Amino acid sequence: YWWSRYWMYSDHELRELCKNFENYNIPLDVLVIDMDWHYTDKGRGSWTGWTWNKELFPDYRKLLKDLKADNGLRVTLNLHPAEGVRSYEEQYEAVARDNGVDPATKQEIPSKKSFIKSMFRMF
């Protein structure tokens, strides 16, 4: 069973949600974390985003590890890669270099074949 809901969940709320699935004996195999796993506010994101929202997920690595260990869950993130990578993303410098762009230019890395290759290597 997959769970997906367009909602601004926090780390704590997702943990509680998973406990409720377990308490009510509802099977859950895959948890989809929707848009707000990354920043979506003006100036730091939009539909496309690559930097974890630290206000909602202060330690996302621990969350993902715990969901797997405690609940056996697979987690997938809702991605909208159409806008490529912008200069405010944490991974921008590495992605820019990987795509032959000088990071100092702050040029957007468009969503094209070379970017997709970088996406799978770096994200």
Walk through the language-model features, giving the residues of each.
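Aromatic-lined carbohydrate-binding/catalytic grooves of carbohydrate-active enzymes
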Residues: Y1-F123
